[in-house]
């Protein structure tokens, strides 16, 4: 499928000036400023160039690629965010990428360095952030990532401390649902140490269909009181009932509150069914409880070495209502409780023993570490992660109607009695459990391989190993299905950035800055074979405030191990609209993995243009074109 997207985005940005002057040029740690004021006031004086030595903001990304957006402390405060998660959500229009498969999380950096994962810093308060930088996809290559996501760099303040407790309660205007959240966060940041601990407790009540006035009949003839359907010629319930009603009666609601209804009472409900709505026994939102603890510790061992550790645990419980147990019986004409004189069908729901439901409990434990070390002009980063996700799900199946059906057929059980079905028991529930474990270790080496008059040749080498383990077991109707999948992924990639011309050297003073980049990598999957990835890009900056970029990327992707082997779950009584028949139905929906899935190949073409006009303050214009195959 070919998808072409053309977008022109107006972005408001805030610059951090080095000096209160108009034209600023940054190369490495040198800022060159043309003194226009001298030229204006003294035309006979030869123009002079003032060289001001300055340092980059500590923690900024060392790249010549201009950021898409920068936020200072005032900009961050204006977002009204309470965590870094809120900030990422607020800058999503600038941070999301149109490349690749879309929908992925931007790459997150902290002080210009890789982290083990977003959870390492997501609970930091926004007040601890000095600046936020958003970079285009090309910068991802510098850190060993694919160029299909943009990069967000959070720059921390050198010294910060806080202890915050937050309570939130949310209720919709129409009621019926409430969500409570309690969170406490401790943060300590110094020049060489960072500590953050966050504890969060969330509770939410269930929201049923009836609380939103939804009718969930699903085209069913089942009803709490019961409905009668005919089995005779032309679907007739009873010729005698036809005579009383004056028409052919094919369906009739059971008179409510009557233990021995007669034909005259059924005539009052002729060709009218009892209400089959069971919205009070079906949830739109489940009842949920969640406890999460997240902690991070980081320390700089000297100016060139940083170690970070993170641990996270989350417990989540859900309870969903899936409707009422129900079935259809054949009520024989010979039954002493039947007034019809011939066989009919009785269809009804039962409030006892209780609604069908699904209970789910999930335990998630994650830990990660990051080691950053400078080796001369090179930066070596090692990240490691382990995640364990254990889930247990129990789904109530329908009730066991065997004894009840036998009693109705034998004529010993009154199907219209108030206590009909009071002693029902559920069939054995469906059980599903899964244990998903992921381990990964990745090493990245990035630095300057060669210094040229036009600029530095940058190389990035990345190697990684990932092991995924999925074990699942499903028990349904007495049949047990076990799935055990393993996947090892050894991957390597290299990226090179080569400056062709420099603005202050040779031809570059006339035609501007030109640079090219390229990357190639492969992954060897134990259960899927070898997958390749590649990319190349061209960058042209004819002026300091105008940049054009063109790039092509391609890769091969395998289905996730969960997509192949997740346990199958059957969810009963899911309201579904049949477009062919034009009616709503209750159906059983099966979800889970499919071991027959095949791989995917993708190719992207990307064109970008960025312009920051000098005559409009805090204004940027970005043009992007994507073509995805």
Q: Model-predicted segments: where are they?
A:
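Non-catalytic regulatory/gating segments with a bias toward low-complexity or hydrophobic composition
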Residues: 76, 88, 132-133, 152-154, ...
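A beta-strand signature from Gram-negative outer-membrane beta-barrel systems
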Residues: 115, 124-166, 208
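Short strand-turn segments of transmembrane beta-barrel domains in outer membranes
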Residues: 133, 151, 160-187, 197, ...
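Transmembrane beta-barrel strands of outer-membrane/channel proteins
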Residues: 165-171, 182-184, 197-203, 309-315, ...
């Amino acid at each position: 499928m070919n998808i072409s997207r053309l977008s022109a985005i107006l972005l408001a940005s805030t610059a951090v000036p080095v000096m209160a002057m108009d034209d600023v040029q940054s190369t490495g740690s040198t800022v060159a400023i043309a003194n226009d004021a001298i030229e204006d006031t003294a035309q006979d004086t030869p123009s002079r160039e003032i060289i001001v030595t300055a340092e980059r903001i500590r923690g900024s990304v060392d790249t010549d690629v201009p950021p898409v957006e920068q936020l200072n402390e005032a900009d961050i405060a204006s977002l009204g965010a309470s965590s870094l998660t809120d900030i990422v959500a607020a800058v999503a229009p600038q941070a999301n990428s149109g490349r690749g498969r879309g929908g992925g999380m931007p790459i997150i950096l902290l002080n210009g360095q890789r982290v083990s994962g977003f959870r390492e810093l997501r609970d930091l308060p926004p007040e601890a952030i000095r600046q936020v930088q958003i970079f285009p996809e090309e910068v991802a290559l510098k850190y060993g990532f694919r160029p299909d996501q943009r990069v967000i760099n959070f720059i921390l303040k050198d010294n910060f401390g806080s202890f915050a407790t937050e309570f939130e309660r949310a209720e919709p205007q129409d009621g019926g649902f409430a969500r409570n959240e309690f969170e406490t966060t401790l943060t300590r940041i110094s020049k060489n140490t960072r500590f953050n601990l966050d504890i969060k407790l969330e509770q939410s009540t269930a929201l049923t269909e009836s609380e939103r006035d939804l009718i969930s009949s699903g085209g069913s003839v089942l009803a709490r009181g019961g409905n009668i359907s005919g089995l005779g010629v032309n679907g007739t319930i009873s010729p005698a009932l036809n005579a009383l009603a004056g028409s052919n009666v094919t369906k009739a609601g059971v008179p409510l509150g009557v233990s021995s209804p007669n034909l005259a009472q059924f005539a009052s409900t002729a060709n009218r069914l009892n209400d089959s709505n069971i919205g009070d026994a079906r949830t739109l939102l489940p009842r949920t409880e969640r406890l999460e603890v997240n902690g991070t510790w980081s320390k700089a061992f000297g100016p060139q070495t940083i170690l970070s550790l993170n641990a996270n645990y989350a417990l989540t419980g859900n309870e969903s209502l899936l409707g009422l147990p129900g079935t259809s019986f054949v009520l024989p004409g010979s039954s002493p409780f039947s007034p019809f004189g011939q066989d009919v069908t009785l269809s009804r729901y039962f409030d006892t023993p209780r609604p069908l439901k699904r209970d789910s409990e999930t335990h998630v434990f994650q830990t990660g570490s990051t080691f950053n070390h400078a080796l001369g002009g090179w930066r070596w980063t090692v990240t490691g992660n382990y995640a364990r996700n254990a889930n247990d799900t129990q789904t109530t199946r329908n009730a066991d109607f065997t004894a009840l059906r036998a009693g109705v057929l034998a004529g010993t059980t009154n199907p219209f009695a108030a206590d009909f079905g009071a002693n029902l028991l559920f069939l054995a529930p469906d059980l599903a459990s899964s244990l998903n474990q992921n381990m990964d270790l990745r090493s990245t080496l990035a630095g300057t391989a060669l210094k040229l008059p036009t600029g530095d040749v940058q190389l990035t080498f990345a190697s990684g190993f990932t092991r995924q383990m999925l074990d699942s077991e499903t028990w349904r109707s007495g049949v047990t299905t076990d799935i055990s999948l393993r996947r090892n992924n050894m991957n390597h990639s290299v990226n090179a950035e080569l400056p062709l011309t420099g603005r202050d050297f040779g031809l570059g003073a006339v035609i501007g800055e030109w640079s090219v980049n390229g990357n190639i990598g492969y992954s060897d999957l134990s259960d899927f074979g070898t997958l390749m990835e590649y990319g190349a890009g061209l960058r042209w900056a004819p002026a300091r405030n105008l940049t054009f970029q063109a790039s092509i990327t391609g890769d091969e992707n395998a289905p996730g191990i969960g997509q192949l082997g997740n346990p199958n779950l059957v969810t009963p009584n899911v309201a579904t609209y049949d477009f062919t028949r034009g009616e709503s139905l209750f159906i059983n929906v099966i979800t889970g993995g499919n071991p027959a899935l095949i791989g995917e190949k993708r190719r992207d073409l990307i064109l970008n243009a960025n312009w920051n006009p000098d005559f409009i303050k805090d204004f940027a214009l970005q043009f992007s074109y994507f073509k995805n195959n």
